[in-house]
Amino acid sequence: MDSLDRSCQDWCDRKQHWLEIGPPDLVERKGSLTLRSHHKKYSKPVLVYSWHRDREAFPKGYDIEGPEKVKKLCNSTYRRLGTDESPIWTSETHEKLSQMCLNTEWVEMKSKALLNEETVSSGIIERVTGLPATGFGAVFPRHPPDWSKMCALTTYSEDYVPPYDYQPHAYPCQDDYSIVHRKCRSQFTDLNGSKRFGINTWHDESGIYANSDVKQKLYPLTSGPIVPI
């Protein structure tokens, strides 16, 4: 009876092993790259056959294959509740996918100066090299003092020079935004306009315009009530 049970168990093991490795012509040999081994235990870094099944069965936050003699499956992620650790565990994939909501193109970049007090030293620029300071052969080329004079020279200033020096007369700046000389819409002749001011827009004959007060101050009444135009 024992031999029958043992033979049945061997047949089941061989059947299961045959279903896992595939056809009989792909029999696993020791030293092969498939690593479909049932009699030897590999470490976690070695990705053997059906390694993902074991990883999915592991509880989070607890090493099921640790050196402890007595295994405690309750030591999983739930032991972190109520502690001072990070409240939410975020996977690396979730963190990378959440970056699509961040617009990094409009992030303000801090400008860094090329020259500052630490990188610039007066001894480097003003050192004695034995070469002329300006002109041909100078280490640091510099423009002559009258370099910008060529931008100010014109034909008129060169050919039509004033005969003597004189001080130009400074005219006072007048108020160019005055409404004294502005022509307003007439209440008596411009009757075709629809945008008129007043209570009765079509028969406003008060004679008061927007610049009437300014005209009275500029042209005071001297001889008659007629205001000059």
From Swiss-Prot:
Q: Which InterPro entries match?
A: CFAP95
Q: Looking at the record, which segments are called Mn? A: 153-163
Spell out where the chain is glycosylated: 75
Q: Where are the transmembrane segments?
A: 124-140
Keywords carried by this UniProt record: Cell membrane, Cell projection, Cilium, Cytoplasm, Cytoskeleton, Flagellum, Glycoprotein, Membrane, Transmembrane, Transmembrane helix
Q: Which GO terms describe its cellular component?
A: axonemal A tubule inner sheath; axonemal microtubule; cytoplasm; plasma membrane; sperm flagellum
Q: Which residues form a coiled coil?
A: none
What induces its synthesis? Answer: Down-regulated following embryonic stem cells differentiation.
**What subcellular compartments does it reside in?**
Cytoplasm, Cytoskeleton, Cilium axoneme; Cytoplasm, Cytoskeleton, Flagellum axoneme; Cell membrane; Cytoplasm
Annotated Pfam families = CFAP95 (PF15139)
* Chief localisation class: cytoplasm
Q: How does it sit in the membrane?
A: Single-pass membrane protein
Q: Which domain of life is it from?
A: Eukaryota
Residue intervals on the Cytoplasmic side: 141-229
Q: In which tissues is it expressed?
A: Expressed in undifferentiated embryonic stem cells. Expressed in airway epithelial cells.
For the Extracellular compartment, the record's topological domain ranges are 1-123
The record's subunit annotation is: Microtubule inner protein component of sperm flagellar doublet microtubules. Interacts with MYH9. Interacts with MYH10.
**Function, as annotated:** Microtubule inner protein (MIP) part of the dynein-decorated doublet microtubules (DMTs) in cilia axoneme, which is required for motile cilia beating.
Q: What is this protein called?
A: Cilia- and flagella-associated protein 95
Q: What is the originating organism of this protein?
A: Homo sapiens (Human)
Gene symbol? CFAP95
